[in-house]
Amino acid sequence: MRFVYHPLAKEPTLKIEGESYIHLYRSRRIKSASRLDLRNLKDGFLYTYEHAEIAKKHALLRLVGVQPLEIMANKKTHLILSVIEIKNIEKILPFLNQLGVSKLSLFYADFSQRNEKIDSAKLERFQKILIHSCEQCGRSVLMELEAFSNTKEALKAYPKASVLDFNGETLPASADFEKGVIIGPEGGFSEQERGYFKEREIYRIPLDMVLKSESACVFVASIAQI
C-alpha cells in the first residue's frame, strides 16, 4: 500500500473509523509510532499524519507534513466502452487504472447486455475498486467514471472520439486517445451504429484473433502510453 485514501485528507486532524480502521489497525496492525501517508485523490498532494490516539474503534491523526507529488501516466486516455458484464468491468478496472486511463465512459450499445444495469450504486462500487487500486499502485488522481443510456448519447458527448472496429486502419500509437476511443460489445456494432460512425476515424487492432471487449480495453490503454 503506497498511501491511505481519505476524502478529507489535508485537514489538520482526521478520524479513521469503519472499514479503513479495521484494515489499518486490525489487519495491518499499524502502531501508534507509525506515520501514515494519505491522499484525497483530488489535489495531487501527499499528506503525512502522525497518531494522536488509537482507540478500540477509531484513530485520530494529526497532520505533520504536506508534499506536492503527482503520480499519473504521461498521456491521457479516454475509453468509451459499451456495457459488458458487470463482473468483467470490475475485473479490468484495476488494470485500466494502473495503465493511466484518465476517464472511462460506459454506454449501452445495440448489442449490449441490457440486463446489466449501470446505476449510481454500481458507479460507487466501481469507484471503491479504483480507490483500492490507487492505494496499491500509487496513482494520485482518481479515474473519472460516467454512463450513457445509448450509443447516440455517447457520440454526441464526444464528437471527436474514434472507433475501434474490425474494418478500420491499424491503431497507431500516435492516435489522439484523449479525445476518446469507442469500444463495442462482444457482438460488435450494429449496422445502424456503423452508420453513425461514417464521419469518424475507424481503427482496428492488428491481430487476427477476436478480442473480448475487456482485452481490447487493456490493449488500447497500453498502446496509448507508448
From Swiss-Prot:
Q: Per the annotation, which location comes first and is thus the protein's main one? A: cytoplasm
- For this entry, list what GO says about its biological process: rRNA base methylation
Question: Is Repeat found in the keyword set?
Answer: no
- Catalysed conversion reaction: uridine(1498) in 16S rRNA + S-adenosyl-L-methionine = N(3)-methyluridine(1498) in 16S rRNA + S-adenosyl-L-homocysteine + H(+)
Q: Which GO terms describe its molecular function?
A: rRNA (uridine-N3-)-methyltransferase activity
EC assignment: the record states 2.1.1.193
Keywords, sorted A to Z: Cytoplasm, Methyltransferase, rRNA processing, S-adenosyl-L-methionine, Transferase
List, alphabetically, the SUPFAM superfamilies matched: alpha/beta knot
**Role noted for this protein:** Specifically methylates the N3 position of the uracil ring of uridine 1498 (m3U1498) in 16S rRNA. Acts on the fully assembled 30S ribosomal subunit.
Localization = Cytoplasm
Q: Which CDD domains match?
A: RsmE-like
Q: Which PANTHER family match?
A: 16S RRNA (URACIL(1498)-N(3))-METHYLTRANSFERASE, RIBOSOMAL RNA SMALL SUBUNIT METHYLTRANSFERASE E
* Name of this chain's protein: Ribosomal RNA small subunit methyltransferase E
Protein source organism: Helicobacter pylori (strain J99 / ATCC 700824)
The entry assigns this protein to a family as follows: Belongs to the RNA methyltransferase RsmE family.
GO CC entries: cytoplasm
- The yes or no answer to whether the keyword DNA repair is present is no
Q: Which domain of life is it from?
A: Bacteria
**Family matches, as Gene3D superfamilies:** 3.40.1280.10
